Amino acid sequence: MGEKGCESCREWQEHCYREHMDVSRIRFFRLMTGDFAHGISIPEKVADRFSGQITKGFNLKAPSGETWRVSVEKVADELILMSGWEDFAKAHELQENDLLFFTCNGRCNGSFSFDVLIFDASGCEKVSCFFIGKKNSIGGQTQNAEQYHLSDSEDTSTPSTFLVGSPHKASTSKKLNGKTKTNPRKEPEDPNSSRSHVKHEMIEEEKSDDDDEHADYEHADYYYSRFANYLTGEEREEIFSLVSLQPGNPVFVTVLQAPQIHRKGLLIVPSGFAADHLDSRSQEILLMRPNKKEKWYVKYYHASTTRGFNCQRWIKFIRENRLREGYICIFELMKGARRVTMTVHVIGKVDDRFVLLG
C-alpha cells in the first residue's frame, strides 16, 4: 500500500512539474563530456516540459552578462544545442568535466532565455567566464566585451578582488597637460552597501589620480595604475632612468600586488591606456622582456568596466620571470610591430634603491 502511495505521489509530482509549473522556474545542468564542443543535449524531461516551445532556440546569458543565440535541433529524438553553441563553448574555453548550470528566466525576443553558470572540474566558478563575450550580440549592437557587462560611465561596482592595482577609469576621459584625467558619474548609493564600499574605493582612486601633486605632466603617453600613482616624482624619475624606452612608445606602469600574481589573478590595464592605444576587443598580446628571446602570448580581455590580463599564460609569464609582489612593471607598447607587442621592464628595490631586473 505504501509503495503504491509513493508511486502515486511521484506521478502527481511529475504531472504538476510537466503541466503546471511555470517554465521560468526550470533549471538543469550539463556535464561537459564527449563531443561537447560541437553540441550538447537538453535533458529529456526538460525538453518535454517545453513541449515544442523552444524550436526557435535559446538565448544563453553568460556570467559576463553577454547574451548568445543558440539554435536547437532535433537529432534522434533528442534536442541538441547546435548552431551558435560551438562559438559559446570556444569563447568560454569549456573543458572536459566543466559543469554548466542553466536557469530559465523567461522569454527574450520570442525565445526562451537561460542564465548560465559555469564551473570547472574543481567545483568552483570559472573566473575567466566573467570576462567572455561575443561580437554581434543580441540586440544588433556590436560587442567585443569579454568582461563584466558594465559601463565605465556608470561607475558601478567591481569585485573587490579586482580593485588591487585598479586603473584610471575611462568614464569621461580626456588629456590635461599630457595626463589622462577622468570624471566619473556619481549616483546615489546606500552607504552601507558593499556596492557603495567598492564605489568609494574607486572614487578615491580617481581622486588620487586627479590630486597627484607628483603627476608626470611631461609625458602624455604614460599611464599609472592605482598603486603606481603613489610613486613620487623623484621615484618616477629614478625608475624611468633605469629603462631604455623607444621614443613615442606609450607605456603603463603598475606595482604588482598579491592578487595579481595569484594563479587566478587579474592584472588590470589602465582604462585610459586601453582606450587610447588598444582596440576595443579581446585579443592576444605578445609580451617580451628586454634582451630575452622568449615570447609570451597572453590573452587580453576587454569589457565595459575591466580590461586586463587573466589567463594561465599570464600566470606562466609571472612564474617564468619570477615576478613578486611589490615589483614595478613598465609595459611598453611597441609602435610599428606587426602584432600588438609589449616589452615589459621589471624593477625591484634593493637596499632602498630601485634596480632593473633581468
UniProtKB/Swiss-Prot annotation:
Residues 25-122, 252-350 bind DNA. The keyword Transcription regulation applies. Residues 156-181 have a biased composition (Polar residues). It comes from the Eukaryota. Its main location: nucleus. PROSITE patterns: B3. PANTHER family: B3 DOMAIN-CONTAINING PROTEIN OS03G0622200, B3 DOMAIN-CONTAINING PROTEIN OS11G0197600-RELATED. The keyword Transport does not apply. Residues 148-215 are annotated as: Disordered. GO terms for cellular component: nucleus. Keywords: DNA-binding, Nucleus, Repeat, Transcription, Transcription regulation. GO terms for molecular function: DNA binding. Transmembrane segments: none annotated. CDD domains: B3_DNA. It is found in: Nucleus. This is B3 domain-containing protein Os12g0592300. Residues 203-215 have a biased composition (Acidic residues).
